[in-house]
Amino acid sequence: GVEIDVTATMDQPVKTVTTIVRGVPRGKLSSSGGDFADVRDNEILLGYPFGGGDLFNAGGLTTPVAVIQSADDAYTTLSSLDDKVRTKRIYLQPGENGYKVELIHEAEGWLDLKTLRVPTWKISHTKTPEAAYAAHYEHIRTAYHFPDYATRPDVPAWLHDTALVLTLHGQHYTGYIFNDYARQLEILRWVNTQIPGKRVLAFLSSWDGRYYWDYPNYTVNDRMGGDAGFRALVTEGQKMGFRMMPMFGMNSANKKQPGWARIADAVTHKVDGDEVDLNWVDWDNDRHQEGWLGYMNLGVPSWRNHLQGRIDEMITKYGVDAYFLDIAGGWINDTKADMHAGMRTMVNELRAKHPNVLCCGEMHYDAMLEFIPLYHSGGGARYAKDYIQRHAKFFSHLSTPAPGRGSSGVHEAGFGRFNTETLQLNATSIPTLQLVDDTFDKQRETMAAVIKQARERAGI
C-alpha cells in the first residue's frame, strides 16, 4: 500500500488540497461499507460527511473510505486516516486503463489556516472485501474512542431491554393531525396488552405542532391536547412502562417564527460563504423548494443554548426518558464554528445534568458513535454493520411505510408500499411499528403481527 501526506502553505488561507492518483484499477465500487455496484463509465463523486457539504451533488459517506473491486480477489481501498470531522471528497474519473482519482481534503472553514496539513490518505490492496474495510474501521474505532454498546455508560438499562419502537406520528406540516396526545395514549394502552410496556420505546414525532413549521419553539401544542394532554400521555405511558422520546430538529429553525432574531447569527454558511437554507422539501406543494427554514449550527452558542434549553425543559417539566435529534448526521463545514463540537458539547452537558436520559440521532457519521448510541437509520451497510453495531443500535426510519396504505405520516416521503411479508422488519434494526391516522383502527391485525415478531425476537 501507499500512504500520502501533504502539507500546503500559502500567503492566504488554504481552502482545499487535492491529491491526484492515476492508474487506480477500475471495477465495481463500494463506499462506507455498502454493497459493490457496477458504476460502468460514470464519473463518481463521494462526499463525507452529509455528501461533503453538498447534499445533492455527491454520494454520501458516513466515513471517508471507498473500495474498488477489480477482480474476484483484488480490492483497492481509498481511505482517509483523519481523527477529526473534516470534509473529504473522493472523485473517480474513468479512463481506458484505470481511474484518475482525486482525494480532496477541505480545511476547517472557521480557522482560516495558511498552512494546512492533510491527514494521511492510505491506498491499500487486499484480496477480500472484509479485509479491504477492516483497517479503516479499526482506525476510526480508536481515533474517536468508540465505547462498546454492551458497556457504554450513555445507554440506560432499559434500552438494553427494548424489543420494539413505536413511531407515533403527530401533526403534519399542513396542520393535519394523525394522532393527538389522547389517541397516542389510547394506542399505548392497547399495545401494553400485547407486549409489556417496559420493553417498548415510544418515539413522539411532531409532538410540538406543525412539522418543521413550528421549529424551533418545541412547546406542547394546544390542538394536539395541550399541556394536560401531553402530561397525561407521558405520565400514564410511563406508568405502563413505556419510555417516551420526543423529536427535536437539531439544525432546523423557521425564520418566520418570532424568536428568529435571537438565533439568526447561527445560520450556517458554507466554506465559501453561501448561506444554507433547509430547502430540499416542498412543504406547501407549490412544486418549488421553500426558503423559510434556516440550517443551523450547534457550534454557535445562541443556537446551542436555545435548543439545549428547550430539550432540558422538556426533560425537567415532563420527565421524558429520551430525546431525538433530527438530521443529526448533517455536518456542514461552516465559517463560524464546528457543528460536531457543538453537538458533542450539548449532548454531554445534557447527559451530565440528566444522566439517565438517552440521546438518539436520526443518522450518523463515524465520529458520532463516541457519544450517541442509538439511531434510526444507517446501521445495515453490508461490510460496515458488524463494526457499527458493536457500538450503536438502530430502529426503522420515520419515513418507513406504515401498515395499510404505506403512508410516511408526518415525513415528506408521502406513500410507499408496506411489505406484508417482511412487515418492514429487518435483522439489523430493532422492530419498529409506524402509527399514522388509520393504523390503529384499520390495521390492528398487522400491528399484532409486528408485535408478535418483536416478542419472538426478544424471547418474550
Regions found by a protein language model. Give the residues of each.
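Carbohydrate-recognition beta-sandwich/jelly-roll modules
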Residues: 1-201, 236, 243
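Conserved, mostly hydrophobic/aromatic
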Residues: 113-114, 191, 237, 307, ...
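Active-site groove signature of glycoside hydrolases
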Residues: 191, 200-208, 306-335
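Structural preference for beta-strand elements that scaffold enzyme active sites
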Residues: 163-165, 199-201, 241-245, 321-324, ...
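Active-site-proximal loop/turn and secondary-structure-junction residues that shape catalytic pockets
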Residues: 206-208, 250-254, 328-331, 363-367
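Aromatic- and glycine-enriched glycan-recognition loops and surfaces
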Residues: 166-271, 305
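Active-site-proximal substrate-binding groove within the catalytic cores of carbohydrate-active enzymes
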Residues: 111-114, 118-121, 165-169, 173-174, ...
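Active-site-adjacent "subsite" loops/lids of carbohydrate-active enzymes
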Residues: 229-235, 246, 250-313, 317, ...
